């Protein structure tokens, strides 16, 4: 079938949540003509759940997005009300930044960025159909019967895809925050042959700030020391009058209220059918699963400077409204709190992610990409990371350039995408530091070193960011070289100085770099013996030097593992491989290979249920085929 289009674009992005804005901005900045279509422009980059960006693993993802040339880091640095570095008492691999956002300002600021972006058309429009010819995407059709042509389409519909909100025994069609649900498009994706799943997530009630008794809660202030998500942000712009959060707890009375009303809880009455998030369960689920716990933490998080709404983090629920009120009033500090918004659960359709390539393009339809909660993830950061990769690859496909695949050793974004396309997910997927086997090289402090050259190569990193990066990289390289050459000798004067500082004296000569490997020796101490750098070093360069030097042995071991895995990743598997033709392979492995259709030996080796023997047989089979082809040639 041939279509007549009302307008033509290179890339169309469907949905303007956190995935959609990153996808559309990336493609537009790479020179493509882009349409960003969304049901409601007021919901662009909206935060329907928690008013925060970052956190464990997620904060590193935001840094990675920024390093590649994405927008989330810059946007939150302009709109936060509190900033805090997490896990400071632990090793550098798990440290991550978290910001409380002014959620209205965050969305408004991002909307201004999108509106001003060259090559990007923003349109309030509901897309009902992905138009496909000969298994290739050619455009979209809207609810108003407008047809827009495109060489690539990125679907980032979030929880709107056949969304249904649930509160007690009330269930109605809706996207997040009572926006319209996208039902016709959900039907269309299924008709196109994509396998669809059904997930559930939820949000807690909001209470009025002036009705909270803060004296009964524990204050949670932000950090005084400047920290930023974007590598472009400056310390002098760090917010001084930050707004605190507050900590309180559930108690036995709270738990009794929930237990006495479980028969009215949609999760337990059978109303909720979708699979919920393991790492962000509802309060009723927590009370049942962790019956031995006599209390659970609740954080009271302001939703912005110009609003009275406070998000009760940890109290996600779909209990009936009257039960939610009773529950809130059982909590210390909230005895007289006024509930402004009711908590709710939302069920929605997802595209099962094993159907995707590592570029986030569907295997079934050329030019059709999906990203964000559409792929079964949870969280704004996970969505934004996928949106960025999908937008980059949509642009590269249109431009006829090589695709971008972030490996597990490149970024947490790469870990997430590999997990999704290789293992799939049976529940809303959340990034955790424990998912990354190379986490010591995927740190908060080195995201730019890892990814800014990649962003530059694909055309997303502009001259300003590139020059800032080069200055930092050159400073780091020069000072690391100097510290590797400058020596401390075990002479009397040096050892007396070391002992005066309370440290063990030298027995052998060593470089300043070797001296810094001692746990107690930081950069400032080392330079007392070898002198300062020839230039004033940025504090972030010093932080990077200390981490790279102190953990060098562990980092090198990780890099050795990366090199071994790289060899596996370079061994490609033909798209048209006949899995039934491989003798002796285990039945479970054959079934998994058929379902996922891995692209490399490395990916095949990470599929659950596939053992080393299966991989050995597969490699022998591929080598035999290669030899046969070489003889024919």
UniProtKB/Swiss-Prot annotation:
Transmembrane segments: none annotated. Pfam families: GIDA (PF01134), GIDA_C_1st (PF21680), SAM_GIDA_C (PF13932). It is found in: Cytoplasm. One of its GO terms (molecular function) is flavin adenine dinucleotide binding. Keywords: Cytoplasm, FAD, Flavoprotein, NAD, tRNA processing. Coiled coil: none annotated. Its main location: cytoplasm. One of its GO terms (cellular component) is cytosol. The keyword NAD applies. GO terms for biological process: tRNA methylation; tRNA wobble uridine modification. FAD binds at residues 15-20, 127, 182, 373. The keyword Membrane does not apply. It comes from the Bacteria. SUPFAM superfamilies: FAD/NAD(P)-binding domain. NAD(+) binds at residues 276-290. Its cofactor is FAD. NAD-binding protein involved in the addition of a carboxymethylaminomethyl (cmnm) group at the wobble position (U34) of certain tRNAs, forming tRNA-cmnm(5)s(2)U34. Belongs to the MnmG family. Homodimer. Heterotetramer of two MnmE and two MnmG subunits. This is tRNA uridine 5-carboxymethylaminomethyl modification enzyme MnmG. It comes from Streptococcus thermophilus (strain ATCC BAA-250 / LMG 18311).
